[in-house]
């Protein structure tokens, strides 16, 4: 199996001037067929999720590496977007790249997602490198996937890696499409691709500070108040300076402060997590600021301390259904077993047949704990619920009868081995 280290014809230079950008637009306009696009962000280094490199490839239109920072706000972006909106755009794992592409000004109207398409086609390993090995018989190195793409100038070997990522996408798209046609699932994939483009941005998570790593060590509400305030201060500063929050002030430091409550600046600097991170210039240059912030945390009145457990707005966790909602629990066991069987029959992962949250919402039935008999009315109500929750027509056709049937089964199934294996991704996962 050949290992590719650079695209055929070599890696092109970075496009970082208006003149070279106009040349790119002309070349892409003369190309034919779909346009492959990829983007590199600086996750783990920067707070923002903006693109720091955009790669574009089109047959007959060339391979191009665009610097979106240098070209940000230029009128020529609109010309590029006009071309893109007229063609199918090929992206691997598009939900990761679409937000930063749209932020730059690229707004596809027709999508082919090679990662999602491969999932629906029934392939188990759907990362770009494994798919290239399986479907194209070529090997791609992935050693630069987690580097800091915000630095300038970018290293040549990084650019080779980035160019290859988009250079293989059109051939990969054709192979994935062939698999989907062969398995009669191309229409499934097309509906999912269209749904991705129509989807609204996700709502902000409630109480994101509760996801601080190490929260299992916290035993009291005062400690939670300290964590919340330091998390919020860190988030504000990280956003302003565009530095990844954990790189600015780590979760381990926040949790140590909440647990040990240093009373002096010396105590703070003596914390193991702080001593370890003092090598980090980002922390050293703000020591006085962080110590002042810590002192303010100690002044938070008890009336403002958060509850130990967040009050959820969504469904109760399935682990409590057996005791509190026994009928919903029984219905869920049947839904889960049926979805696993359907997943095997169609070679589609359960979470792509129907998302766990959607399946649980239908089955929970707003906690009514009703027994049902199979009827046209029940099937119609399940179908309407799935539509309201954003399920695609193909998902509704396959899953609505199954979920309606599950609502008629009031005796729970035993925890089968196959169900336990699928629990992480099935409708009972949290």
Annotate each predicted stretch with a short phrase.
Residues 1-35, 39:
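N-terminal accessory regions of nucleic-acid-interacting proteins
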Residues 4-7, 11-14, 55, 60-170, ...:
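Active-site-proximal helix-loop-helix substrate-binding element of RNase H-like nuclease domains
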Residues 46-49:
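Short glycine/proline-enriched turns and hinge-like loops at secondary-structure junctions
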Residues 156, 176-430:
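Accessory DNA-binding and partner-docking regions appended to nucleic-acid-acting proteins
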């Amino acid at each position: 199996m050949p290992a590719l280290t650079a695209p055929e014809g070599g890696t092109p230079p970075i496009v970082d001037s208006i003149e070279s950008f106009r040349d790119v637009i002309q070349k892409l306009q003369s190309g034919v067929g779909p346009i492959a696009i990829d983007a590199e962000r600086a996750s783990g280094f920067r707070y923002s999720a903006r693109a720091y490199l955009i790669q574009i490839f089109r047959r007959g239109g060339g391979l191009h590496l665009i610097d979106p920072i240098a070209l940000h706000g230029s009128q020529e972006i609109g010309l590029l977007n006009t071309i893109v909106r007229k063609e199918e755009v090929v992206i691997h794992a598009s939900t990761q790249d679409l937000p930063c592409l749209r932020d730059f000004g690229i707004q596809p109207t027709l999508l082919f997602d090679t990662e999602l398409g491969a999932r629906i086609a029934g392939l188990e390993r759907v990362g770009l490198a494994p798919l290239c090995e399986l479907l194209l018989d070529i090997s791609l190195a992935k050693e630069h996937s987690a580097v800091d793409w915000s630095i300038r100038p970018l290293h040549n070997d990084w650019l080779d890696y980035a160019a290859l990522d988009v250079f293989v996408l059109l051939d990969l798209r054709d192979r994935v499409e062939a698999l989907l046609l062969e398995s009669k699932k191309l229409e499934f994939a097309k509906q999912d691709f269209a749904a991705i483009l129509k989807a609204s941005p996700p709502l902000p998570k409630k109480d994101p500070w509760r996801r601080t790593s190490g929260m299992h060590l916290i035993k009291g509400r005062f400690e939670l108040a300290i964590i919340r305030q330091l998390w919020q201060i860190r988030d504000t500063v990280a956003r302003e300076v565009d530095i990844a929050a954990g790189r600015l002030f780590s979760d381990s430091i926040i949790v140590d402060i909440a647990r040990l409550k240093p009373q002096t600046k010396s105590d703070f600097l003596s914390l193991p997590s702080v001593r370890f991170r003092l090598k980090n210039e980002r922390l050293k240059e703000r020591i006085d600021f962080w110590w002042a912030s810590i002192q303010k945390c100690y002044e938070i009145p008890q009336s403002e301390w958060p509850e130990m457990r967040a009050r959820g707005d969504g469904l109760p966790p399935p682990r409590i259904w057996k005791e509190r909602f026994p009928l919903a629990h029984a219905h869920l066991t049947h839904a889960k077993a049926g979805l696993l069987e359907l997943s095997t029959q169609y070679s589609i992962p359960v979470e792509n047949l129907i998302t766990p949250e959607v399946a649980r919402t239908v089955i929970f039935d707003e906690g009514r704990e009703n027994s049902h008999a199979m009827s046209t009315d029940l099937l119609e109500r399940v179908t309407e619920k799935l539509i309201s929750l954003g399920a695609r027509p193909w998902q509704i056709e396959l899953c609505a009868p199954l979920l309606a049937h599950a609502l008629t089964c009031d005796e729970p199934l035993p925890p089968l081995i196959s169900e336990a294996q699928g629990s992480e991704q099935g409708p009972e996962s949290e």
